[in-house]
């Protein structure tokens, strides 16, 4: 009898706790309920605008995952159409069994022109690399290299809707050089470069080059930290303070235009190297494998995106560069991609350089 009473008391307590939890969930200020309500509202508005097809449900899940918000039914319909076209391209590509795969990501509701406008910089003539100053040696290079294993590669960042890739490539190289030299990590200011490096033929959110960013830092006297000069993703007035400079550039080293042997030597034996290449439609949907293209160019005026080469290797018999991007850790292979090596693919060795820090 006593056991029965205890069991009944336990059930009543559990029911009371469940009721209390239920009432707490239903409270309007409960953040979980707010998220669920927001998800249902977004899904409802999308399905109302484009119907209840399987593709529509896929689009609704995509919009929720990437925090999309659309102002009107017309905007939903437009984005759904773009998403559907990109999805068809992705599926068609993946059926071909090529060396890399594509997948849906946060850019899948953008047209190619929209993507280019907000994520890529204008083509820059990197004439400084026509005659490089990296010195080759007879040292034997390792078969593969990944500087992440040494702990000097900083976390992947996101440039947002600003063509400031060149600043992230630059800070990535500087952060690696700093960690290598001083044994500790640092996060440096991309925004300072966006706002302040214009006199060195850089154009803020409209593009620039790491080699020119290194020259700016060298002659300007230093670069501040991300904390001291935070990123906004917009062109702004220069707020540099020499008192808060965290790193100085003594010099920069350029890889001879197109010389992948020099680039491999530098990546193997020195540290990560800033590189640039031409992004063509399709690359934005990269999801894994070794990227290759027959439509991208490799001339100095072709390149439109700067990144950071952090290693190299071979996958499925195809040699590749291991490269850190600036489109967030959700893009590609945790923010990284592999690019075919040996053909100066898309100009990967056309505008390459690395800094020497103090």
Curated annotation (Swiss-Prot):
Pathway: Aromatic compound metabolism; phenylpropanoid biosynthesis. Glycans are attached at residues 125, 254. It comes from Glechoma hederacea (Ground-ivy). The keyword Glycoprotein applies. One of its GO terms (molecular function) is cysteine-type peptidase activity. It is an enzyme of class 4 (lyase). It comes from the Eukaryota. This is Vanillin synthase. Pfam families: Inhibitor_I29, Peptidase_C1. Involved in the biosynthesis of vanillin and derivative natural products. Catalyzes the double carbon bond cleavage of ferulic acid to vanillin and of respective glucosides. Belongs to the peptidase C1 family. SUPFAM superfamilies: Cysteine proteinases (SSF54001). Keywords: Disulfide bond, Glycoprotein, Lyase, Signal. Disulfide bonds join 162-205, 196-238, 296-346. It catalyses: (E)-ferulate + H2O = vanillin + acetate; 4-O-beta-D-glucosyl-trans-ferulate + H2O = 4-O-beta-D-glucosyl-vanillin + acetate. Residues 1-21 form the signal peptide. InterPro entries: Papain-like_cys_pep_sf (IPR038765), Pept_asp_AS (IPR025661), Pept_cys_AS (IPR000169), Pept_his_AS (IPR025660), Peptidase_C1A (IPR013128), Peptidase_C1A_C (IPR000668), Peptidase_C1A_papain-like (IPR039417), Prot_inhib_I29 (IPR013201). The active site is at 165, 305, 325. GO terms for biological process: phenylpropanoid biosynthetic process; proteolysis. Residues 22-140 form a propeptide. Its EC number is 4.1.2.-.
């Amino acid at each position: 009898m006593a056991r029965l009473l205890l069991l009944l008391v336990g059930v009543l307590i559990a029911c009371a706790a469940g009721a209390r939890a239920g009432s707490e969930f239903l409270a309007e200020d409960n953040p979980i309920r707010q998220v669920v309500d927001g998800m249902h509202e977004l899904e409802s508005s999308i399905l109302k605008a484009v119907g209840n097809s399987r593709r529509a449900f896929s689009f609704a899940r995509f919009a929720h995952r990437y925090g999309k918000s659309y102002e009107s039914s017309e905007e939903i319909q437009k984005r759904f159409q773009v998403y559907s076209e990109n999805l068809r391209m992705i599926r068609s590509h993946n059926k071909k069994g090529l060396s890399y795969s594509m997948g849906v990501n946060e850019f899948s509701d953008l047209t190619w022109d929209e993507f280019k406008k907000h994520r890529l910089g204008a083509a820059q003539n990197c004439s400084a690399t026509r005659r490089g100053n990296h010195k080759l040696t007879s040292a034997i290079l390792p078969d593969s290299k990944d500087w992440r294993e040494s702990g000097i590669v900083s976390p992947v960042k996101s440039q947002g809707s600003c063509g400031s890739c060149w600043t992230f490539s630059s800070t990535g190289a500087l952060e690696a050089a700093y960690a290598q030299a001083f044994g500790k990590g640092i996060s440096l200011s991309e925004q300072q470069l966006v706002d302040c490096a214009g006199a060195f033929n850089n154009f803020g959110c409209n593009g620039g080059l790491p080699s020119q960013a290194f020259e700016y830092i060298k002659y300007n006297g230093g670069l501040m930290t991300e904390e001291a000069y935070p990123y906004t993703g917009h062109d702004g007035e220069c707020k540099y303070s020499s008192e808060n400079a965290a790193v100085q550039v003594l010099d920069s080293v350029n890889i001879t235009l197109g010389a992948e042997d020099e680039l491999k030597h530098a990546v193997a034996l020195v540290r990560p190297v800033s590189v640039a290449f031409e992004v063509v439609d399709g690359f934005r949907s990269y999801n894994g494998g070794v990227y290759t293209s027959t439509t991208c160019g490799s001339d100095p005026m072709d390149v439109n995106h700067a990144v950071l080469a952090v290693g190299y290797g071979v996958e499925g018999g195809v040699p590749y560069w291991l490269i850190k991007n600036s489109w967030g850790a959700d893009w590609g292979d945790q923010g990284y991609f592999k690019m075919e090596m040996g053909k100066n693919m898309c100009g990967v060795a056309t505008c390459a350089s690395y800094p020497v820090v103090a």
